[in-house]
From Swiss-Prot:
<dbReference type="GO" id="GO:0006107">
    <property type="term" value="P:oxaloacetate metabolic process"/>
</dbReference>
<keyword id="KW-0120">Carbon dioxide fixation</keyword>
<dbReference type="InterPro" id="IPR022805">
    <property type="entry name" value="PEP_COase_bac/pln-type"/>
</dbReference>
<dbReference type="InterPro" id="IPR021135">
    <property type="entry name" value="PEP_COase"/>
</dbReference>
<dbReference type="InterPro" id="IPR018129">
    <property type="entry name" value="PEP_COase_Lys_AS"/>
</dbReference>
<keyword id="KW-0456">Lyase</keyword>
<dbReference type="GO" id="GO:0015977">
    <property type="term" value="P:carbon fixation"/>
</dbReference>
<dbReference type="GO" id="GO:0005829">
    <property type="term" value="C:cytosol"/>
</dbReference>
<feature type="active site">
    <location>
        <position position="138"/>
    </location>
</feature>
<feature type="active site">
    <location>
        <position position="583"/>
    </location>
</feature>
<comment type="similarity">
    <text>Belongs to the PEPCase type 1 family.</text>
</comment>
<dbReference type="InterPro" id="IPR015813">
    <property type="entry name" value="Pyrv/PenolPyrv_kinase-like_dom"/>
</dbReference>
<keyword id="KW-0460">Magnesium</keyword>
<protein>
    <recommendedName>
        <fullName>Phosphoenolpyruvate carboxylase</fullName>
        <ecNumber>4.1.1.31</ecNumber>
    </recommendedName>
</protein>
<dbReference type="InterPro" id="IPR033129">
    <property type="entry name" value="PEPCASE_His_AS"/>
</dbReference>
<dbReference type="GO" id="GO:0008964">
    <property type="term" value="F:phosphoenolpyruvate carboxylase activity"/>
</dbReference>
<comment type="function">
    <text>Forms oxaloacetate, a four-carbon dicarboxylic acid source for the tricarboxylic acid cycle.</text>
</comment>
Amino acid sequence: MPLKKLESSNNQAIIAEEVALLKEMLENITRRMIGDDAFTVIESIMVLSEKQDYIELEKVVANISNQEMEVISRYFSILPLLINISEDVDLAYEINYQNNTDTDYLGKLALTIKDLAGKDNGKDILEQVNVVPVLTAHPTQVQRKTILELTTHIHKLLRKYRDAKAGVISLEKWRQELYRYIEMIMQTDIIREKKLQVKNEIKNVMQYYDGSLIQAVTKLTTEYKNLAQKHGLELDNPKPITMGMWIGGDRDGNPFVTAETLCLSATVQSEVILNYYIDKLAALYRTFSLSSTLVQPNSEVERLASLSQDQSIYRGNEPYRRAFHYIQSRLKQTQIQLTNQPAARMSSSVGLSTSAWSSPASLENPILAYDSPVDFKADLKAIEQSLLDNGNSALIEGDLREVMQAVDIFGFFLASIDMRQDSSVQEACVAELLKGANIVDDYSSLSETEKCDVLVQQLMEEPRTLSSAAVAKSDLLEKELAIYTTARELKDKLGEEVIKQHIISHTESVSDMFELAIMLKEVGLVDQQRARVQIVPLFETIEDLDNARDIMAAYLSHDIVKSWIATNRNYQEIMLGYSDSNKDGGYLASGWTLYKAQNELTAIGEEHGVKITFFHGRGGTVGRGGGPSYDAITSQPFGSIKDRIRLTEQGEIIENKYGNKDVAYYHLEMLISASINRMVTQMITDPNEIDSFREIMDSIVADSNIIYRKLVFDNPHFYDYFFEASPIKEVSSLNIGSRPAARKTITEITGLRAIPWVFSWSQNRIMFPGWYGVGSAFKRYIDRAQGNLERLQHMYQTWPFFHSLLSNVDMVLSKSNMNIAFQYAQLAESQDVRDVFYEILDEWQLTKNVILAIQDHDDLLEDNPSLKHSLKSRLPYFNVLNYIQIELIKRWRNNQLDENDEKLIHTTINGIATGLRNSG
């Protein structure tokens, strides 16, 4: 049965109704705030924007006072936010409706498993596949947590819109409640007054687990097993989705990540998942009133019941309730042990008096914490078996099944935490250790070969460590060793899986990896036979990606490395950086270099008998590797996905994908389906054509790289253009993350972090990282020989990688606006700097023409009508914000705004990012 499209014409009509209603309410609230006369300014601005009369729009905006700017910029920031909510609600509704009512509907996962069931290795693939979304704290989420909480309420209310229309609930009361929340959001500070701290980022991301991810991952895993069973495949304990996290462990460029934040990240995770179990056990306690006078439990349930401290006379004949009470008591002790704080919600959630917890039995039979999730699961399994023995299998479904599945997936923490640090920091620490131990006085001056010889020798000097209490350590070394010590303690306490990887940013050599091994050895996480934390190189720049094959070949040749990998099921993970490679060489060079690197690294792994797995460091925007997840995965090189893939999810993308459990389920389903399809299917129509396609790409990408670097690195005015004709300075002062905008003082483009680079190009609507250099490179190839355009058209139709590459450019171009970009260019002080815009404009027009020619389309987004419709509905609103932002930046730079007014610029940044939906 074919997969039905989620976007229907009826759905678009509902969205239009909702948007009209939301707009009406927002208008009424704003009128009341500023009066009818002032609101006419907003109305005139809207008319001019819809007519695209940008000259007149600029004049009107220039005459708005600073005081009026506050409400007007707020209005145009809130409106696209409300449109986003409406679209998200209707996507969730359609997913839920088709899953629950349409018997002909088969989601992508169902189709994928159905197709796989007939293959000889189908069961093995389904048992082994593991997709790991890794949530990061990259600063691209501009919304305050308070705003997100209010939007959640509006989301829930809009879910009831159809019921309100149908009279199932009171339409008038529904409208009143919706109006209340829109009024609250309109009168709430959009911008954070202070920069986020790491502890805030940890707390913020936990709301997605509490609100959607635990349920979505658990439900999806259960459905995964059921679908396989439906086709005759009994899976043991598959983990198609597990979660990862950087927050609290990613200290690359962030001095605020410490041993304390790493510990906090793990502790808060334990608290959240244990509270989830406690709540589920509370629900089971309330409902499992089975009487032993009617149903006799097995001996193990009777044993659990006998250990319960619930001494209520009313529970004497209810062994299941008392068994659940005992299990819950042990969870309480487990939470105290793992988090050093009691389960405060426990007794009240169960509905018992506090005396039940302090009965005399507690002194004679102290409740012990669970040693591991395995012990917890064993108690639940005992109850399950008793129910099966009595023919009560129906009672297993629901909360009991959910909590058992959750234990298998999560255990006592939610996500494996990655550690990450820059290679230069590790080199400095190792140099200090070697000097302090009188081994090498100036380690950094050694050649690469000499460095590796020294490091491997020290790694083989077991169990000797280099640090000594007698030798003073720098603050940097103390901090790094403290983090690794905490990592070891957390692994001992919560299990090996809690911290599995350490990523090395800017990996440029084999010694970078051995330097990390030295640091890990200092705290007992590495020895000759085993690495308890896998060393993961991150290749980021074009040059490093080109060198990755040789670096990994040399690394995998060492005997000690072979021992480490052998204890990790023969896997070696490699992280690929999409952001820096794009900033370094442009969109085409980045995409193609990453594609080739995966092929080469996979081959090197096969030569050494090692399974190479890839961790894709993608952002939200195309310029940082973003785009539709399904297409991104299925366009990877065939053979590059063995059975495991990891990918980053960050900033505004986390909210978009995981803010609602139905949408979260849908996105996770897409990730699994795409990964399985890429594992088993050679997507290209004719595999024999791939060599000729590669030759064509090599030629085009070489030209693209030259064109890109000529402007970005060779044009003496480009640096000033970026800093003067974009809001980069204002973006850098926005409180959207704990991490600084640059690793050091910015004096050149290479020193700027990728996120503010991409974020700023999104704000001025050029979207530069997602397309620059594409048009000229393709045009040169097309002009080289007759028939070359037809060859590119054939590649677009038959090669998923190439199709995805161009579709992303198509999407980025549709969000750009050169009329607005021209106005930003006028912010530059000199004509030479302003003239950079015309180079960009020429390339933009050429890129658009070439992309449409290769696609054989008349207009952008012909293949994506839903996005086209969505952009059409929201563009007039956030186009206005660009003109307001330009005017405010002029005033700010001319000292016509005071410090309190800077937040007006930040409001526009927020609104534009909201309208674009993926901005960093």
